[in-house]
Every structure is written in C-alpha cells, then in structure tokens.
Amino acid sequence: MLIAAANKWILYLSQTYEGSVHDKRVADEEDLEFGADDPHRETLELLQDLGFQGYKPKGVVVIQPMKKPKGGELTEEQKTANRQISRQRVVVEHAIGGVKIWRMVKEQIRSWCHQLRDRVMYLACGLHNFRLKCRSHSIRT
C-alpha cells in the first residue's frame, strides 16, 4: 500500500505482503493516523479505490467510488461521480506506474531474504521521488 500526493510524490509505503492480501486488511494493519498534528486535517482528502471498501480513518474525508449494487445498476449521477473520482485518482495510479518502471519491481523476487522485497520497494519509491525532483529542477529550453 502506498500513499501519494497530488504531484505523484510518494509519501508513504507500507511493508510488502506475500501473496494476495486484501487492501483493506493491509490498511487496517498499518493503523495510520492522517494529519494527527495538522490543524487543518478535516480538509485532507483520501482518495481510495473499492479495494478499501469500509476503511474510514479518522481525520480525513474519504472519497471513494460507489459500488454497483448486487443485481442492480448505478444511476447516471453515480456514474458521473465515479468518473470524476477516477480523474482525481489517476494521479495515484501514475505514481504506482512510476515505481513499476524498474524491472526488479515488476518481476517476482525469489529470495530467502524476506526483507529484500521491502528494500526493493523502498528503493524504487525513492528513485521515483528522486526522478520527480530532478524533473522539477531541470532547465527547460
């Protein structure tokens, strides 16, 4: 699980989990406190996908697409709202894509050292942030 800012900067990366683990379970285990010392924390928005259904941490406004009801359909207003949320969330998906440009992240890591997965992800996120920083400081002609 990672948290990215609107400028694609990766702010937080959880430890890696082996196998398939539900996003909400990872979020619950991380027990994050958003903006605990920020006086404007009510204005923090957490954009999350449907994998985090039911995850509502304190101190933030949760923005999540509406799930299609079982055997039903979403209204046009709900579909429009979901599209608007997706337009905002695409920044996070681009940040994840920026981390996954590194071959070692894309492929399965076969190692007896379980900490290696975490280290590879930390390094990939650090390189992603470094790349963003270099782009912002580059001289454009």
Model-based region annotation:
Residues 1-141:
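Short, well-ordered secondary-structure "scaffold" segments embedded in the functional core
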